Amino acid sequence: MVSVQVNENESIDKLLKRFKKKYERAGVLKEFRKKAYFVKPSIEKRLKRSRSKRRAQRANEERNS
């Protein structure tokens, strides 16, 4: 569970910003979306490969630019 201590004289905006950062880094939302529905292992592997391929293509394009 993500928790944030309130510092003295800290605005709500700063507190909220720190909370959002911790929340994102903890991967709570990512994990929730991942477990929202079942994905077959074969499809999961296929998606992982395609994401990896796209990432490699982008990196290659950036190096060539």
Curated annotation (Swiss-Prot):
Keyword Hydrolase in record: no
A GO MF label: structural constituent of ribosome
Any one of the GO CC terms: ribonucleoprotein complex
Family: Belongs to the bacterial ribosomal protein bS21 family.
Name of the protein this chain belongs to: Small ribosomal subunit protein bS21
Gene3D superfamilies xref list: Ribosomal protein S8
Region (Disordered) location: 46-65
Key words of the record: Ribonucleoprotein, Ribosomal protein
Any single biological process term in GO: translation
Skewed-composition ranges (Basic residues): 46-57
